[in-house]
Amino acid sequence: MAYTLDRGSYAAMFGPTVGDRVRLADTELIIEVEQDYTTYGEEVKFGGGKVIRDGMGQSQHSRQEGAVDTVITNALIVDHWGIVKADVGIKDGRICAIGKAGNPDVQPNVDIIIGPGTEAIAGEGRILTAGGIDAHIHWICPQQIEDALHSGITTMLGGGTGPAEGTNATTCTPGPWHIARMLQAAEGLPMNMGFFGKGNASRPQGLEEQLRAGACGLKLHEDWGTTPSAIDVCLSVAEKWDVQVAIHTDTLNESGFVENTTAAFKGRTIHAFHTEGAGGGHAPDIIKLCGEANVLPSSTNPTRPFTRNTLDEHLDMLMVCHHLDSRIPEDVAFAESRIRRETIAAEDILHDLGAFSMIASDSQAMGRVGEVIIRTWQTADKMKRQRGALPEERGQNDNQRVKRYIAKYTINPAITHGIAHYVGSVAVGKLADLVLWKPMFFGVKPDLVLKCGTIASAAMGDPNASIPTPQPVHYRPMFGAFGGALTHSAVNFVSQAGLDGEIAQQFGLRKTLLPVVGCRTIGKADMVHNSATPHMEVDPETYEVRADGRLLTCEPATVLPLAQRYFLF
């Protein structure tokens, strides 16, 4: 006999369905379910007296006969392509299906087969997102990986060799020897990783040897001399070898102005780091680059969002990170030239307009590695409060804004760095790098982090308790982060040249190496929900920023969500 549930009871049992709305943590952001892949009355759920039992929701199908390794049931997927309710099937470490799970022998419309070999993860009442991608990493210490993983980041791209002065300031792993050592170090770290070689050179040979050693991209940094000549050579090498170039431009305008740097690009694609400028770049108008069709602009998280404390903390950060001396007036002037209220305020609005495409950390080098996701949603919330609903929103929800902001740390850095074939969204065929959140903790504290289908991190209670939940609950590495499972739960991204040169055998690597692909054929138009190219103007005296003639300014936030309500310290 059929039984009708009211919406509240249904949501409590199986999670929200079409038309239901969910608040994201303590923000003003509201999402609404757009589609539900289930068949009402045939939902699957694990537990005592529930559906996933032998002969009911669990079939007799073996793995060879199509049963999945893991099913995530009734999850609310939040991704750039939609906000939908679905079951998710995982097999061989990849997402194999998004749809309806169950037993095809007794249930209709089943496209994810549950069998005796299937593990179940309860997605009811929880949000599922793709693992985040942080594409601006200074590899200063390996402990960054743990903090990032616990925050929901599953891929980290950047450069460095440890706490050397070169790494503290620049995201470069210079030379084949250091690249080999970092790839070997990555063998023991449960994170997808990729390493940028140093891109500052006026001849190509020193850059090409780094790509043959497995660098997944090149980084131009002003502390190594980002001259027009170095820019041109680096981009020429990248065009030949199909890798991305990231750039930190010339704050002091010693070798040219922003117009000279733009000319040196010659229309070629480039990832512009901290395009607002507080993290470095042509003062005061590097922000103009977000209007260029070939420039893929990102922010680093210390300026996200603009608050009453943003300016005060930046000066000291900058002095430390760039090896400056407060006793030298020129060093102080260099630091002060980068910190501008007007451009930081404009950055908030440019993110909301989709003119800034990505957000990353700048880990331990004027950025916080565990706060990429938090700062992204704090920015989205601040803009909702200050600017209201986006014009393209339909209904009483913020779906379009949420899709825009989640793309900034998932699909867009994946596209930018040639890894979107593997990661960056909840999509069939991609690695099962997935994050589950309770709505009340969305963006700030994940429940589970899966790496290639294996749980690698979780909020876990006392291991000596009789159940998993007693205090103290804190993040702990799970089985996917240990032993031989680790090298099957994470990958490293390298150049095709490195793969062709058999660096796995040369360096004794066990992690899967995947080549970056398609880095040179993309542009701003490929940045999902973040492809705007406004005409940018910056007043050199007042630093006022205009986009398409409109002054961009906003007040600093005095209170933020996802902050002290969730943390003791």
Curated annotation (Swiss-Prot):
It is found in: Cytoplasm. Pathway: Nitrogen metabolism; urea degradation; CO(2) and NH(3) from urea (urease route): step 1/1. It holds the Pfam family Amidohydro_1. Its EC number is 3.5.1.5. It is an enzyme of class 3 (hydrolase). GO terms for molecular function: nickel cation binding; urease activity. Carboxylation allows a single lysine to coordinate two nickel ions. It catalyses: urea + 2 H2O + H(+) = hydrogencarbonate + 2 NH4(+). Its cofactor is Ni cation. GO terms for biological process: urea catabolic process. Residues 131-569 form the Urease domain. Binds 2 nickel ions per subunit. Ni(2+) 2 binds at residues 219, 248, 274. The modification N6-carboxylysine is found at residue 219. GO terms for cellular component: cytoplasm. Ni(2+) 1 binds at residues 136, 138, 219, 362. It comes from the Bacteria. The keyword Flavoprotein does not apply. Substrate binds at residue 221. SUPFAM superfamilies: Composite domain of metallo-dependent hydrolases, Metallo-dependent hydrolases. Keywords: Cytoplasm, Hydrolase, Metal-binding, Nickel. Heterotrimer of UreA (gamma), UreB (beta) and UreC (alpha) subunits. Three heterotrimers associate to form the active enzyme. PANTHER family: UREASE. This is Urease subunit alpha. It comes from Magnetococcus marinus (strain ATCC BAA-1437 / JCM 17883 / MC-1).
